[in-house]
């Protein structure tokens, strides 16, 4: 097993052996679900070593799922059951519905499901049987499932991210159109009020091209309006969010704005649930990949497993550490809303990360490698601040 997979597996709240021991004492049956948009294939593994039984296929509808749970409850005399299915585009509706019936359900990480190298046959039936069998043996790794509140905030931050991507694409198209026709802006900064005033003065020889310009400009403005609206909604939602105090604590860090802080916690939830900062780094795919055998040890690029949204946010935040460490007015205003201990951790982090960025850059490292290394350590400091905000031990040496 590679180091990345081993470390990633350790992120879970219990080991495979612990889950196996607990499952064997609690659950009478293990139900594998291969969930698709319109259907769910169902397999059942009873306690023991018997081969899983294929139960059949049901529609992916609430009524059909309720009927299935009732039938299985009667079959096992009301004893607890464990349902398992892979994380995917169908979300967590099945999870919440099964949990509401009093049975257990786990959504498992597809990338961490053990698979035989020579197995080349894949069907819904075989997948359901595999999930039931591996669930019984305790070899599945469950993912963290957000609460409905958490999922709503995550949908909001992802919508803002999608609209921002549309805005950037609209800007690129407008810029390419202008460059293609020799219309170059002489000002310092684009997409400012001055830049948009200049766009109003641009004229083309043909009316058709003038219409094209107006459409491109309108597309940029419309995208900006959507982004601004979603960001306003994020600010409005924050005070009532259960993780609002943690967001404010993370904002004491350089490079972590309200948008970045909400994105991190919307995607990961309470990051203080990780036992150590190394587990969080591995979960985000910010640790080096490794292929070691015998006496040789070879490390490669980062694993890029886990949540890519948070990884992107942290890498972007890491760029701010290329400048010397200092307490700017904006950072100080955000930090003053937090405790002295959190302020001390944030300042210690800034001094260390700015110095690390400078040292790595001086060695000739590629800029992307430098920012990734800084992002990895930044994740560790965010974990310490989250633990402090939640009243959990973190072992940071920074003191007020």
Model-identified regions with their sequence ranges:
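A detector of single, family-specific signature residues
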Residues: 1-400
């Amino acid at each position: 097993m590679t180091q990345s997979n081993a470390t990633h597996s350790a992120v879970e709240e219990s080991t495979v052996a612990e889950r196996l021991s607990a499952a064997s004492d609690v659950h009478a049956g293990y139900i594998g679900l291969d969930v698709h948009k319109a259907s769910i294939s169902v397999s059942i593994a009873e306690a023991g070593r018997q081969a899983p039984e294929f139960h059949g296929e049901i529609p992916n509808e609430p009524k059909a799922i309720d009927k299935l749970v009732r039938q299985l409850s009667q079959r096992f005399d009301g004893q607890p059951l464990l349902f398992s299915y892979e994380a995917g585009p169908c979300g967590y509706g099945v999870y919440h519905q099964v949990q509401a019936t009093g049975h257990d359900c786990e959504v498992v990480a597809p990338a961490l499901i053990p698979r035989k190298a020579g197995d080349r046959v894949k069907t819904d039936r075989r997948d359901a049987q595999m999930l039931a069998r591996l669930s019984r043996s305790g070899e599945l790794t469950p993912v963290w499932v957000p609460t409905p509140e958490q999922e709503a905030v995550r949908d909001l931050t992802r919508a803002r991210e999608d609209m921002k991507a549309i805005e950037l694409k609209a800007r690129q198209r407008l810029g390419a159109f202008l460059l293609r026709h020799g219309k170059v802006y002489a000002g310092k900064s684009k997409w400012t009020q001055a830049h948009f005033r200049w766009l109003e003065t641009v004229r083309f020889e043909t009316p058709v091209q003038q219409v094209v310009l107006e459409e491109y400009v309108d597309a940029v403005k419309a995208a900006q309006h959507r982004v601004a609206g979603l960001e306003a909604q994020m600010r409005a939602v924050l005070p009532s969010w259960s993780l609002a105090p943690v967001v404010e604590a993370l904002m004491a860090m350089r490079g972590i704005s309200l948008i970045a802080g909400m994105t991190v916690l919307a995607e990961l939830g309470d990051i203080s649930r990780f036992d150590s900062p190394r587990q969080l780094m591995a979960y985000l795919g910010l640790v080096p990949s490794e292929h070691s055998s015998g006496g040789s040890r070879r490390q490669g690029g980062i694993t890029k497993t886990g949540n890519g949204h948070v990884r992107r946010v942290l890498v972007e935040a890491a760029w701010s550490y290329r400048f010397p460490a200092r307490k700017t007015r904006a950072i100080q205003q955000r930090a003053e809303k937090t405790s002295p201990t959190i302020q001390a951790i944030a300042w210690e982090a800034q001094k260390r990360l700015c110095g690390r960025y400078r040292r790595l850059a001086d060695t000739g490292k590629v800029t992307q490698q430098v920012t990734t290394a800084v992002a990895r350590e930044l994740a560790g400091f965010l974990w310490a601040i989250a633990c402090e905000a939640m009243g959990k031990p973190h072992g940071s040496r920074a003191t007020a």
